[in-house]
Amino acid sequence: MTETKAKSKSKENSSSPVPAAAEGQQQEQKRGNSRGGERRGRRSDRRNQDRDSEWQERVIQIRRVSKTVKGGKKMSFRAIVVVGNEKGQVGVGVGKAGDVIGAVRKGVADGKKNLVRVPLTPNSSIPTLSNGRDGAASVLIRPAAPGTGVIAGGSIRTVLELAGIKNVLAKRLGSKTPLNNARAAMVALSLLRTHKATAKERGISLEQIYS
C-alpha cells in the first residue's frame, strides 16, 4: 500500500508542473498581444495627430440665429469656418449647434468634407485668371508676380491664404456677405486648371497656349 501511494504522489508531482508552465506561456502571450495592441493604438493616434496638425482652421463669422418652432423660438449658433493645409487644399464649412464650440466643430467637419484642390505655381500663385459666383456674390482672382502678396480682404483673403496662395490679386463684386464671398472664392479656385491640363483638354500643345 505504501508503495502504491508513493507512486501516485510521484505521478501527481510530475504531472503538475506541465499545466502550470502552459498557463505561464499563455499569460505571456496575452501580455505580448496587449502590448502590441497598445503600440498599434499609439501609432494610429500619432498618425491622426500628425494629420490633424497639417490643417489650419479659421473662424470667419459666428452668429446667433433663431428658428421658429411650435413652442416658440429655438436659439442656436452658426459658425462659418475655413479649413486648409496651405498646400493646395481648402474648404469652407458651416456648423450649427446650441453652443459656440459645437458649432465650430461641425463647421470644421463640414469644411473637410468639401475640400477643393488648387493647382499652385512654383511662385505660390495661380496659373490663370478665374471668376466664381455664389448667389449675388462674384469674386475675380488673377495671378500676381512674386512679392505681391495676397491682395484681398475679408473671407476671400482667408480662403486664399489657407489654400497656400501667397501672390494673388482678388476683387469682390456684388454681395458683401462673408459666406457668399467665401463660397464664390471656392468656386473660382475649383475652376482653375494648369496649363498642361488645359492643353490636354483642348488637344493642343503647350507652345500653342503660351503663344
From Swiss-Prot:
**Keyword Plastid on entry:** no
Q: Which UniProt keywords apply?
A: Ribonucleoprotein, Ribosomal protein, RNA-binding, rRNA-binding
Annotated domain remarks: The N-terminal domain interacts with the head of the 30S subunit; the C-terminal domain interacts with the body and contacts protein S4. The interaction surface between S4 and S5 is involved in control of translational fidelity.
| Residue segments, region Disordered | 1-55
Describe its function: With S4 and S12 plays an important role in translational accuracy.
Pull one GO CC term from this UniProt entry. small ribosomal subunit
Q: What PROSITE patterns has UniProt attached to this entry?
A: RIBOSOMAL_S5, S5_DSRBD
- One GO MF term attached to the UniProt entry: rRNA binding
Q: Which family does it belong to?
A: Belongs to the universal ribosomal protein uS5 family.
The record's listing under PANTHER family reads: MITOCHONDRIAL RIBOSOMAL PROTEIN S5
Which Gene Ontology BP annotations are present?
A: translation
Q: What is this protein called?
A: Small ribosomal subunit protein uS5
**Record note on quaternary structure:** Part of the 30S ribosomal subunit. Contacts proteins S4 and S8.
Domain S5 DRBM positions: 55-118
Question: Keyword NADP, does the record have it?
Answer: no
Please name the taxonomic classification of the source: Bacteria, Bacillati, Cyanobacteriota, Cyanophyceae, Synechococcales
Which intervals carry biased composition (Basic and acidic residues)? 1-12, 28-39, 46-55
The source organism is Prochlorococcus marinus (strain SARG / CCMP1375 / SS120)
